[in-house]
């Protein structure tokens, strides 16, 4: 035993070395796993020198054993006896003169040491586990006298039948008994845990047995304890916890009796037990019952009077619990009301519940909601949400016509009592929406954000519900609030609330919560008032002198999202000028500055103002200081600044593209400084990280300006329409963008060894395509050549292939583009295969290295990169198919690489087979290749260049002899582990069937209907099937299915064929 204690002391020591601690832990773990663990640790528990930590560890071991040991096992009985003996010893060591032990867990004069709480909780867990495996018929009645034995052992038998005060009992024993009861409920009754069906069935059987045998006994003990523990707050809290936790699954009539409830109520008077009492009462009223019974229970409990009697000057935790209790009563009443509303027979129950809510409970709910502490307010949200939902069904007059809420409302005329409730609720919402006076918008960002997310957003939802129920009342509440606060000049919190309410008001109009006809929304009274408020706000005497981030950002969020309500003269000019002030984009506060840079562009992209070049020149001169790029590789925050700066470049591009004079010389004012910076970067003797990052940022800015110009020129719904772009883009703009393309290429040629520059060059170049259209092709040829001569990483290559796919899609009908790809296809494919080879080598090396460490790692990072690269590459091949350019693969320039392309499509490793998306893509490409040039001739009728390529002899035979073995090897080779029951494998099987059907179809002759003359069938029957010793009966069936079934039918046949063969 001394060795165990020594090991525990070392393991728990803060000064022992790691090696020594490891030895101690290993020793304890060895004992824990030994056959005689129960005996060893049972003996240790009885050792007088055992420490509390040691006893905790021993109890933990025995507790685990109690769950793991099989039923009727002799060790389980031995463990039971050890646990009882330990409990008996603890009670003897802690004994005193009964109920005088008031400091449970703390000791008191004349009392020997009481086990600490963590030990008592572990004792409770041990007995709960013994209960779980020994109690009741489900455990063959191994210990069905569990509760009776414990009651006798812990010295609380005097409480069994007593219904009076002054009863003597062992306080420590009662403490342990209640903890055991609570732990048992955690095992079998706690709904917070998700349990398996088998465990839940056992739990139900245990509860059923308890209900019959012992629950009444327990309820008597609890009641007796409540009568005798008013001076023992720890014990009182424990018994209240027991009552609250068991109430959900025991007969409520055992508890809900006048004397029992009255005794529970007494504990609301004592500060130390108010919290536990409130929690207990919450559980009681949450008991599932029929609506009429629940109403009767709530009426009998009369909890609101009790809550009022507790007063308001309470500890915050108690106040929160009282608010939660009040909310619980109100919520249950509203649920009763909701359940009865649609039943004519239960209308009286519904009305009675509603009357209690309106006249009794809701005033208290609103009082708690209006409390200064948000944590108290929050407790009432679930009732308000539920009750408003009920009121919508009864009274709603608003909501979008045709919406569910409008259709389902009974439209009962609202009475004064309910109208008064809504009015009071609206007033509380307005009161609580205001940011607390203790908050500072500069220093308390997190606190304010939490308030907005958890409190304000919910209050807004309540406001919106009021709007739907009674639009006129909502209109009066919110307009009064805005009227009183919009002209505020001193308190920023009041003005911020006004702006927030303006946003809410505008949203309610936009979402038509007022229920007006769609055509009348813009001319409705709310919309006209909103326009008036926006004008008032724009003419606010002190708003734009405020230096308050929350007010500043809220204002710009409002005017950008709801600028349609701004009806002042020269609206666009007014707003853009406001943006160009220290109140906005030039603010000294970075949060304001960066957010308004984004909102500036969002406003421009939404409204696309048609500005004259004179005003535009003036505006650009104002914001030009913000367009100066200063990259710093050491400052992470500057990257954030640059990301926001890109919004400014896009916004200026949109303004230039949308200018009313269609003049684009003004673009030079933005681009010339950028070009000058690029020249400095290019001429730098050393391309250090500063220079590289500066170059990257400038290229990104140029591309973003280009995107903005195109967005300004072309309507949003036509941005991808090349013909529309061609009509609106003038020659001078094309010349400027050709110059931009040249600048990008020159820069790229100097910096192509840097990955960030390659990314930026590709990004910027892609943004030039919509404007230059097919005039981009000569520049693209040079760009692609530089890329192919660069040391690309796999991810980059994937992105680059995506860029090539974009080019093919856009210019598939351009002869120059066709010739470009005719020249570049082979180099691109070779680059892909070179990278794949490198990744295979890295993957192999990585796997060997990790295997040597004893780990079986199949998928390495290199393998994943290879799969992603293959996916991009197969996507490029699919692009040639979908854009009718497959003849490219048959040209003189590319026919030599074609065998390698096809071999790659026909070769897979075991790991690649289970990459379903990649496999599906590759087989789909192969099927299309067979369909379009499987015979050696390009047969795609839409391919404009098909007539210009010669036939490739032997291609048909190649496809047959390589594809057919693949069709049978993938499903049946053991190393591929192909599971036809798996969804991914079934998809691959379906694709393989289409591959075989394609081979069969291209070899069909229109003049010869003899299936045996089909080259695909001949290879199967004469060469492949005999080679693999395929049964002749199946050969006939398989060939018949291939020849007579259509593609969909053969797909089903092939899947079933694989299924049958693998059985």
UniProtKB/Swiss-Prot annotation:
Record GO terms (molecular function): small GTPase binding; tRNA binding
Instruction: Reply yes or no: does the keyword Nucleus apply.
Output: yes
Keywords assigned by UniProt? Cytoplasm, Nucleus, RNA-binding, Transport, tRNA processing, tRNA-binding
* GO CC, one annotated term: cytoplasm
* Superkingdom classification of source: Eukaryota
Transmembrane stretches in the record are none
Task: Report the record's Gene Ontology biological process terms.
Answer: tRNA processing; tRNA re-export from nucleus
Subcellular localization, as worded in the UniProt entry = Nucleus; Cytoplasm
- Family to which the UniProt record says this protein belongs: Belongs to the exportin family.
Annotated function: tRNA nucleus export receptor which facilitates tRNA translocation across the nuclear pore complex. Involved in pre-tRNA splicing, probably by affecting the interaction of pre-tRNA with splicing endonuclease.
Q: Which PANTHER family match?
A: EXPORTIN-T (PTHR15952:SF11), EXPORTIN-T/LOS1 (PTHR15952)
User: Which protein is depicted?
Assistant: Exportin-T
Which species does the entry assign this protein to?
Kluyveromyces lactis (strain ATCC 8585 / CBS 2359 / DSM 70799 / NBRC 1267 / NRRL Y-1140 / WM37) (Yeast)
């Amino acid at each position: 035993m001394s060795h165990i204690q020594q090991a525990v002391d070392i393991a728990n020591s803060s000064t022992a070395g790691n090696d020594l601690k490891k030895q101690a832990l290993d020793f304890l773990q060895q004992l824990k796993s030994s056959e005689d663990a129960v005996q060893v640790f049972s003996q240790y528990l009885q050792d007088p020198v055992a420490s509390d930590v040691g006893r905790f560890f021993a109890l933990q071991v025995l507790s685990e054993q109690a769950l793991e040991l099989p039923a009727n096992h002799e060790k389980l009985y031995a463990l039971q006896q050890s646990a009882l003996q330990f409990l008996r010893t603890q009670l003897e060591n802690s004994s005193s003169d009964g109920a005088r032990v008031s400091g449970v867990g703390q000791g008191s004069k004349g009392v020997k040491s009481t086990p600490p709480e963590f030990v008592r909780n572990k004792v409770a867990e041990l007995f709960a586990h013994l209960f779980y495996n020994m109690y009741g018929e489900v455990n063959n009645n191994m210990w069905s006298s569990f509760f009776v034995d414990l009651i006798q052992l812990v010295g609380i038998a005097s409480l069994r039948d007593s219904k009076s005060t002054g009863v003597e009992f062992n306080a420590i024993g009662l403490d342990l008994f209640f903890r055991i009861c609570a732990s048992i409920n955690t095992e079998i009754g706690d709904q917070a845990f998700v349990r398996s069906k088998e465990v839940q069935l056992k739990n139900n059987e245990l509860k059923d047995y308890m209900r019959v045998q012992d629950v009444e006994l327990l309820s008597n003990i609890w009641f007796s304890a409540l009568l005798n523990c008013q001076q023992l707050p720890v014990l009182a809290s424990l018994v209240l916890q027991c009552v609250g936790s068991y109430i959900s699954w025991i007969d409520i009539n055992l508890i809900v009796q006048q004397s029992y409830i009255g005794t529970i109520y007494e504990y609301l008077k004592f500060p130390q037990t108010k919290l536990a009492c409130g929690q207990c009462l919450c559980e009681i009223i949450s008991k599932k019952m029929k609506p009429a019974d629940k109403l009767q229970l709530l009426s009998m409990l009369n909890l609101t009077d009790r809550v009022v009697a507790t007063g308001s000057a309470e500890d915050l935790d108690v106040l929160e619990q009282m608010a939660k209790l009040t909310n619980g009563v109100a919520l249950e009443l509203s649920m009763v009301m909701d359940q009865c509303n649609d039943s004519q027979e239960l209308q009286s129950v519904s009305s009675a519940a509603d009357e209690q809510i309106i006249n009794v409970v809701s005033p208290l709910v609103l009082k708690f909601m209006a409390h200064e502490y948000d944590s108290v307010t929050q407790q009432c949200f679930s009732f308000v949400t539920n009750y408003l939902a009920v009121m919508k069904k009864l009274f709603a007059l608003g909501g979008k016509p045709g919406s569910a809420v409008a259709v389902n409302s009974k439209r009962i005329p609202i009475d004064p009592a309910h109208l008064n409730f809504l009015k009071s609720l609206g007033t509380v919402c307005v009161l609580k929406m205001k940011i607390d006076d203790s908050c500072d918008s500069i220093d308390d960002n997190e606190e304010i954000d939490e308030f907005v997310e958890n409190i304000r957003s919910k209050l807004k939802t309540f406001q919106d519900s009021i709007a739907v129920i009674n639009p006129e009342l909502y209109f009066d509440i919110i307009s009064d609030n805005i009227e009183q606060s919009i002209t505020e000049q001193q308190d920023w919190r009041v003005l911020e609330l006004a702006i927030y309410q303006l946003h809410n008001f505008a949203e309610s109009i936009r979402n038509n919560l007022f229920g007006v006809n769609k055509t009348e929304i813009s001319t409705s009274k709310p919309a006209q008032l909103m326009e008036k408020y926006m004008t008032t706000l724009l003419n606010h005497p002190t708003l734009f002198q405020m230096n308050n981030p929350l007010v500043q950002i809220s204002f710009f969020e409002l005017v950008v999202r709801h600028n349609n309500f701004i009806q002042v003269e020269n609206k666009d000019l007014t707003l853009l000028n406001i943006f160009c002030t220290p109140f906005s984009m030039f603010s000294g506060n970075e949060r304001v500055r960066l957010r308004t840079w984004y909102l500036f562009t969002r406003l421009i992209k939404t409204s696309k103002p048609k500005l004259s070049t004179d005003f535009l020149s003036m505006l650009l001169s104002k914001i030009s200081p913000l367009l100066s790029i200063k990259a710093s590789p050491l400052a992470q925050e500057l990257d954030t600044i640059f990301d926001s700066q890109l919004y400014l470049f896009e916004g200026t591009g949109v303004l230039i593209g949308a200018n009313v004079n269609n003049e684009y010389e003004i673009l030079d004012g933005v681009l010339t400084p950028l070009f000058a910076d690029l020249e400095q970067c290019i001429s730098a003797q050393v391309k250090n990280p500063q220079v590289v990052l500066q170059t990257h940022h400038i290229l990104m800015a140029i591309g973003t300006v280009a995107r903005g110009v195109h967005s300004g020129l072309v309507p949003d719904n036509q941005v991808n329409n090349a013909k529309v772009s061609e009509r609106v883009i003038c020659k001078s703009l094309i010349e400027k963008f050709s110059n931009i393309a040249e600048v990008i290429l020159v820069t790229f040629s100097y910096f192509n060894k840097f990955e960030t520059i390659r990314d930026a060059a590709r990004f910027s170049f892609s943004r030039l395509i919509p404007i230059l259209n097919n005039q981009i092709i000569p520049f693209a040829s040079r760009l692609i050549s530089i890329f192919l001569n660069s040391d690309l990483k796999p991810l980059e290559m994937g992105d680059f292939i995506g860029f090539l796919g974009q080019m093919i899609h856009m210019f598939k009908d351009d002869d120059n583009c066709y010739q470009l790809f005719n020249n570049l296809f082979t180099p691109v494919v070779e680059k892909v295969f070179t990278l794949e080879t490198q990744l295979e080598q890295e993957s192999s090396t990585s796997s060997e290295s990790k295997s040597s460490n004893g780990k079986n790692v199949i998928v390495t990072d290199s393998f994943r990169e290879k799969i992603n690269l293959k996916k991009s590459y197969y996507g490029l091949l699919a692009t040639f198919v979908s854009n009718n350019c497959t003849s490219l693969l048959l040209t003189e320039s590319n026919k030599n690489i074609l065998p390698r392309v096809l071999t790659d499509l026909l070769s897979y490793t075991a790991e690649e087979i289970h990459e379903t998306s990649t496999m599906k893509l590759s087989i789909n490409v192969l099927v299309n290749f067979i369909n379009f040039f499987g015979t050696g001739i390009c047969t795609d009728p839409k391919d404009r260049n098909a007539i210009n390529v010669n036939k490739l002899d032997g291609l048909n035979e190649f496809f047959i002899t390589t594809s057919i073995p693949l069709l049978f090897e993938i499903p049946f080779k053991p190393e591929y582990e192909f599971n036809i029951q798996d969804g991914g494998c079934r998809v691959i099987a379906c694709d393989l069937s289409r591959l075989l059907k394609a081979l069969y179809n291209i070899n069909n002759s229109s003049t010869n209907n003899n299936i045996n003359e089909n080259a695909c069938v001949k290879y199967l029957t004469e060469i492949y099937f005999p080679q693999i010793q395929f049964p002749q009966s199946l050969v006939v069936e398989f060939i018949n299915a291939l020849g007579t079934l259509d593609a969909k039918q053969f797909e089903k046949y092939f899947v079933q064929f694989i299924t049958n063969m693998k059985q």
